[in-house]
UniProtKB/Swiss-Prot annotation:
This is Chaperonin GroEL. The lineage of its organism: Bacteria, Bacillati, Bacillota, Clostridia, Eubacteriales. SUPFAM superfamilies: GroEL apical domain-like, GroEL equatorial domain-like, GroEL-intermediate domain like. Gene3D superfamilies: GroEL (3.50.7.10), GroEL-like equatorial domain (1.10.560.10), TCP-1-like chaperonin intermediate domain (3.30.260.10). The gene is groEL. It catalyses: ATP + H2O + a folded polypeptide = ADP + phosphate + an unfolded polypeptide. It comes from Clostridium acetobutylicum (strain ATCC 824 / DSM 792 / JCM 1419 / IAM 19013 / LMG 5710 / NBRC 13948 / NRRL B-527 / VKM B-1787 / 2291 / W).
Amino acid sequence: MAKQILYGEEARRSMQKGVDKLADTVKVTLGPKGRNVVLDKKFGAPLITNDGVSIAKEIELEDPYENMGAQLVKEVATKTNDVAGDGTTTATLLAQAIIREGLKNVTAGANPMLIRNGIRLAVDKTVEGLKKVSKNVNGKEDIARVASISAADPEIGKLIADAMEKVGNEGVITVEESKSMGTELDVVEGMQFDRGYLSPYMVTDQEKMEAVLDDPYILITDKKIANIQEILPLLEQIVQQGKKLLIIADDVEGEALATLVVNKLRGTFNCVAVKAPGFGDRRKDMLRDIAILTGGEVISEELGKDLKDVKVEDLGSAESVKISKENTTIVNGRGDKSAIHDRVAQIRGQIEETTSDFDREKLQERLAKLAGGVAVVKVGAASETELKERKMRIEDALAATKAAVEEGIIAGGGTAYINVLPEVRELTSDEPDVQVGINIIVKALEEPVRQIAANAGLEGSVIIEKIINSEKGIGFDALHEKYVDMLSVGIVDPTKVTRSALQNAASVASTFLTTECAVADIPEKDKPEMPGGAPGMGMGGMY
């Protein structure tokens, strides 16, 4: 396909137009008085959101050069979202500011490669300064503050803080859509997996259609049990002890299942059978997790163990097990604490090594089931449009909270960037163009406060001057339009989010400045449509 090529200033300016179109769309959402953006969807209702990355992903521009610029800045938002889960609007805004100031200097004759070096120096200094003032998240109150600011809703903040308190920092918190109007929290303590009883005759509570086993033995195997003779010696030992049994197997069918059900109905023996969770290698890992959690062994031919040789000592046990039609929950497994700890450490290592997002998510779920628990935030609203918007805000708040637990918190509302300005200004270089790069970051660091003020209908320059001349930590509360100690009133941002936003913005923007040529496809003109058939002409008698 034929290409069109733009050079130098013309190429950079065309791409900058695209950057501005995307950033100007996203930045109206910043701060407590930021507005929403409505996105048209091909199917279903339009989406109303203030999530920077969701807005950026929807933007495609007609002009190929403008679109190139927009796609580059879209990468800033996407990368920040991947790393920190929030801060995408700030990252987009910073990228726009660095590109705008950088292009002015490149046009004036500065060397973009040296400017890039200056930008890198200033960003490193800023990150160093942010880490110095960062404070650790202490307790539920700090978590609630971070989530409240991210979601712009104290109720959501409290909900996420409750969830984190119940499942711990290692726990998994998922967000689901609810059929009801309200938003509620559902916490699953212990290990839950999505497999229910194999026969409804196994239930112990007819009203709830659940089977609850107190202090049961747990047989864990990856084999299919069809012949009752295979496990008969084991069942006899368990009946003698008057205990209950949970069987987790590849499948229990035919004669074996019928025998277990008949004995349950007669009251001879209480046993529930469920299928093993997961598939393939993941199933083996999950069975091993259950075995370690309950202090049992996985009965598998791979490990040289046969069902007929199983003794009671090979079984796991737990305080209680609850089995519904769809889920099995093991509460307080009686496994060795040090073995569980070692398994958790092993999974953590795998999480760090994996490059697949899907694998990482599944490993984190396994980690949560072993180390903490699982909490589900069920989001409800009056309409589907509000539901989707609320769900996105909760997901952002959740990501911000996890980032805060990892690297701590700093003063919010762009205040932290202003607080590190004096240290960045101290950076000097004998090379004038490197100094230009440093000065670009100095100016860009003011941009978040300026935009938050603009979205509140105020003049940013006056506010920035006041913050610079105040003590560190004093910032501008745009919601109530007053100057406050940001940390003490709970206006905080996660250090990881603030750091990632600047690093990703600077990375893409400084590379953008080094562009000297842009190559794009020549848009195809619409081809004329095929002429239609003459009126009245049939298909020549063909059927």
